[in-house]
Amino acid sequence: MIKSILDNDLYKFTMQMAVLELFPKAEAEYRFTNRGSHHFSEEFVEKLRRVIDEDISALMLTEDEYQWLGENCSFLKPMYLEYLKNFRFKPGEVEVCLTEEKELDIRIKGPWHSTILWEIVLMAAVSELYFTTIEKEWNGKEWDGNISATSESILTAYGEKILEIGKILEENGCLFAEFGTRRRRSFELHDQVMKTLLQIETLTGTSNVFFAKKYGLKPIGTVGHEWIMGTSALIGLRYANRFAFENWVEVYKGDLGIALTDTFGSEAFFKDMDLKLSKIYDGFRHDSGDPFTFVDRVIDHYRKMGIDPMKKVIVFSDALNAEAAIRLKKYCQDKINCSFGIGTSLTNNSEFFRESPPLNMVIKLHSVNGIPVVKLSDSPEKETGERDALRVANYIVGRKGLDE
């Protein structure tokens, strides 16, 4: 299910290193949110607990993985690699239960640098367990997770679907990376996706470090919302974007230069993205809101700064499929460079699995040092955080009045 400590997204490791360097004593809490209508069971909770206690807790960096990171991820410092070599997941940091309403409740508490790696592995485990214990029928066939004729036929058919998607992206010149670990249907299906995508020339890499190593691909990723969210608790929300991205430069010296724009809404972001930061960062990542409006806003920002947009890039990562990527590629043509991070559409495709759609879930940072944090986003349905904290945050960034 989770095969390696590297079976995780690159940006969890890069953020872990930054937290260790700048905020080593910070305490964090994360919480799970089920945005969909899927239901869970006591049996599911017991199996998830077992995966946490027995499987994930046993993961450790191998010598081979340690050497590979040193050779292929030069931005990870030797001191951090030594830390990771000794890192072990602590099951006691994770609480799992069903509420009285039969909703799945997951809470992760502990040092920020320690708890930061749980998010992706837990989401991948939740998704795979759901589709092997609750919704076992995949397109009318029961998946058993073993090497059987039924499982092989599903994998083969899914590979054909992914190859079709990849060829469409390739024919339209769309540079893209695979971003689908967190909501994948199963590890085996994810592996099939990666094997298939090796045939596609416009594949730039994968966010999953394990598969990057296995298939000789570039690990892709920079920073997530939690870096900015955590900064807001430790330094203050009003200037969180600026401090977060200046601190990122301090740690990575220009490496990993894609800035995430929507943590507190893109307008607040662009106010903080001054000339220095706009020059240092290679581009911006779009993760919510209208992407076409965003393209125009980014181009306008660069032009006002006297920067040629054709020397910068937008990375699109908001619930993308091939059709959306192609439309955006055409819109950006001769205006600004673009690439795409495509996730669930590759690792749990809803067109292929028509009768059992992927889970709509997130695990987000809830507080740092006991201070609630929020994500405002450019899409209202993606807001996360306590109601009062959201109200104050929207007021501070100028989006709403205190009583709205």
Swiss-Prot record:
Keywords: Ligase, Phosphoprotein, Pyridine nucleotide biosynthesis. It is an enzyme of class 6 (ligase). Its EC number is 6.3.4.21. It catalyses: nicotinate + 5-phospho-alpha-D-ribose 1-diphosphate + ATP + H2O = nicotinate beta-D-ribonucleotide + ADP + phosphate + diphosphate. Coiled coil: none annotated. Belongs to the NAPRTase family. Catalyzes the synthesis of beta-nicotinate D-ribonucleotide from nicotinate and 5-phospho-D-ribose 1-phosphate at the expense of ATP. This is Nicotinate phosphoribosyltransferase. It comes from Methanosarcina acetivorans (strain ATCC 35395 / DSM 2834 / JCM 12185 / C2A).
